Amino acid sequence: MDKIEVRGARTHNLKNINLVIPRDKLIVVTGLSGSGKSSLAFDTLYAEGQRRYVESLSAYARQFLSLMEKPDVDHIEGLSPAISIEQKSTSHNPRSTVGTITEIHDYLRLLFARVGEPRCPDHDVPLAAQTVSQMVDNVLSQPEGKRLMLLAPIIKERKGEHTKTLENLASQGYIRARIDGEVCDLSDPPKLELQKKHTIEVVVDRFKVRDDLTQRLAESFETALELSGGTAVVADMDDPKAEELLFSANFACPICGYSMRELEPRLFSFNNPAGACPTCDGLGVQQYFDPDRVIQNPELSLAGGAIRGWDRRNFYYFQMLKSLADHYKFDVEAPWGSLSANVHKVVLYGSGKENIEFKYMNDRGDTSIRRHPFEGVLHNMERRYKETESSAVREELAKFISNRPCASCEGTRLRREARHVYVENTPLPAISDMSIGHAMEFFNNLKLAGQRAKIAEKILKEIGDRLKFLVNVGLNYLTLSRSAETLSGGEAQRIRLASQIGAGLVGVMYVLDEPSIGLHQRDNERLLGTLIHLRDLGNTVIVVEHDEDAIRAADHVIDIGPGAGVHGGEVVAEGPLEAIMAVPESLTGQYMSGKRKIEVPKKRVPANPEKVLKLTGARGNNLKDVTLTLPVGLFTCITGVSGSGKSTLINDTLFPIAQRQLNGATIAEPAPYRDIQGLEHFDKVIDIDQSPIGRTPRSNPATYTGVFTPVRELFAGVPESRARGYTPGRFSFNVRGGRCEACQGDGVIKVEMHFLPDIYVPCDQCKGKRYNRETLEIKYKGKTIHEVLDMTIEEAREFFDAVPALARKLQTLMDVGLTYIRLGQSATTLSGGEAQRVKLARELSKRGTGQTLYILDEPTTGLHFADIQQLLDVLHKLRDQGNTIVVIEHNLDVIKTADWIVDLGPEGGSGGGEILVSGTPETVAECEASHTARFLKPML
């Protein structure tokens, strides 16, 4: 079998297509957003490959695996087991890190357990158990003729007169002892002070170094070790200042006796009680009530609400503050910022042991006086948070909680013992905090000696390979300790890709969803190299991708189209790239051959130097105290290689600041910055991302864009409705009244099947129409409410042409290119790109003030060249209304049409975090240091 044959595929919008796909090749599936690429790649090929493999397992094993639905296809042959690597961002488990997902951390644990050198945390001395022979050899390696004495420590730094101990030693026949550093006779020991700490060491043997001492020394060492419980000291008799040799037969620090269990891998796992830091349980952060969150506006007074819930409207807490003010002589009406530091301390952290006279008044107006310390606002919140049973109280208080690195482990997540084990003078946390590129260099240069090199050889090979794969997919800037929650979708996908290459499987079908998301052009070549490497191992690699370089690198291209949704679902062209370019109907072919292209604008909107938004001193993550200047009213692109700090600057700094000041959001927490100026030019900030518009089948484009409300009002206004007394609520499928109660307005009923995937069957009462019979008797222009919800946007636009409010909203959905989705299509079936465009349409349809700040993060994800053209038209339209648009983007077609570019770099991770250049695309293209400039220049 050298091909995969698909016959009669009808999944979702596929129109009964037949395909022959070559095996062991790199295949790119492309086409407009919503044309059916994912339906073919994921819902047909992957689903069937996975399902057939899972069917071969026992029924018992199958119940633990989520089963894919059987795709609607007549026949597929030549499939191999399938692995899909999707865009879903990784786990939301705070314990997952880049190191644990890639399994590098597991190999590091093994490495440290097998060849690590434990040291004493206080004295930085290696802990090592030595045999008597090793001790003897060490002493004999000293210069010949040197006078030494062997001591056995009996008492270390303990108070007391110790007369009994000294008498015992003398009776055992020992002649001398060293007491507090002085050698004296045991027949006449000095009187020791009771209240002072003393150290007593018995002299076991005195000798000059020479070769024939081996036997005598061995016996002396055995005696000394037995006396002292495992430690011995060898001191120079002629030079009291010379360094002494410490020997230990225990696995312990010879100075303080600090010892630890034998090293084992679980000691280095922060997800195991044996290795996790006991203070933060291996999370690396501690939660605390943050004074900056509690006092959000220092200009307000305590009475006016500087602390939420403690102002004059809250009688109980406010009378406590008034009593406190009388005691410490401050004014509750004065702005919080003007009160002294001591008052701040007392209000937030309490009065300590100092008693204060509190006046309490009950509901009847009787006052009582009680004296007790004040616990402090933060301690009060902490106590209520711990004690409360109510989730509402806990949710309210959670708004004031911040995270800070754990004080005990300094954010390394590991307990003290594990942090003090070294491989070549480097502890595990130091390796975890290196960037992947840096770590790879470290392991390449790591030279272990002797037996340890043999033990570590295989472990080091595994670590080295995995690091290399991560570097090859462009992730050299991530650190191994980076929490998985903070990774973007593209990063998470490429990590999974790297782990797959690490697995080295052969004969598998890999299905990937746009692996180039979030990758700069510079890193794209390495990613394609990785995909070709997977293919060369002997795998079939199927990639859903719009990226020009990927399409050019493919062995076989499948172009699905010609349109999207109902207009798509057919194979427009397939074969090598030349064959695609030769087909005039193929949009992809036309863009690839240059017959169509996204034009560089003739003139750009000039920046007005008077109107700028200026953010100074941004220092989040890897940002190096940067100052961002954005011209107001322009379309700005933020560019830079992956990991250079774009998301930190815009999503973690600018957006939360603007949210707090413009939208009044209290929980948005910006990354550290100094100052921001120019927000007065805006009235609101809106972030348009690719998250789903709703997570339930009840959410749909009609409800989200607000089209559904006027539609229901139209139906309620029909004469028949008025005669029956139907209100708009009658036509909602979310409330009782008009909906079908058998399926509660879902139109489908979920049937749980064990061993098989859950199936949704159309409701047999309403036949999937969501409404009851009486509601469906009402018609507007000959259509029922169900038929209206079933229309595509295009049909609905014609149908409601005479209703201006509706026509305008539907027109905006047409403008963003969503002509093909249905009004009532469940939000869960929309792709990320589609959800984003529904949000854009909702923004466009509002009557704009022209003072909005829009933030978009990689809006071209999932978009074909033709879709990008539409998106740009919409963004330029928003800009022409006077709005300011900030887009984080790698796509050069978008970058070249921007009015202004801010380029970060020069590299990713710690090598980035600076603004290299900002200005018009023409200015930026001339910058030598910028990687973006190199790729942008030929486009202009």
Swiss-Prot record:
It is found in: Cytoplasm. Changing residue 253 to A/H/S: Reduced activity. GO terms for cellular component: cytosol; DNA repair complex; excinuclease repair complex. InterPro entries: ABC_transporter-like_ATP-bd, ABC_transporter-like_CS, ATP_grasp_subdomain_1, P-loop_NTPase, UvrA, UvrA_DNA-bd, UvrA_inter. The lineage of its organism: Bacteria, Pseudomonadati, Pseudomonadota, Gammaproteobacteria, Enterobacterales. Residues 310-587, 607-937 form the ABC transporter domain. Belongs to the ABC transporter superfamily. UvrA family. A zinc finger (C4-type) spans 253-280, 740-766. One of its GO terms (biological process) is nucleotide-excision repair, DNA damage recognition. This is UvrABC system protein A. The keyword Metal-binding applies. The UvrABC repair system catalyzes the recognition and processing of DNA lesions. UvrA is an ATPase and a DNA-binding protein. A damage recognition complex composed of 2 UvrA and 2 UvrB subunits scans DNA for abnormalities. When the presence of a lesion has been verified by UvrB, the UvrA molecules dissociate. It holds the Pfam family ABC_tran. ATP binds at residues 31-38, 640-647. Forms a heterotetramer with UvrB during the search for lesions. Interacts with TRCF (Mfd). UvrB and TRCF binding to UvrA could be mutually exclusive. The keyword Translocase does not apply.
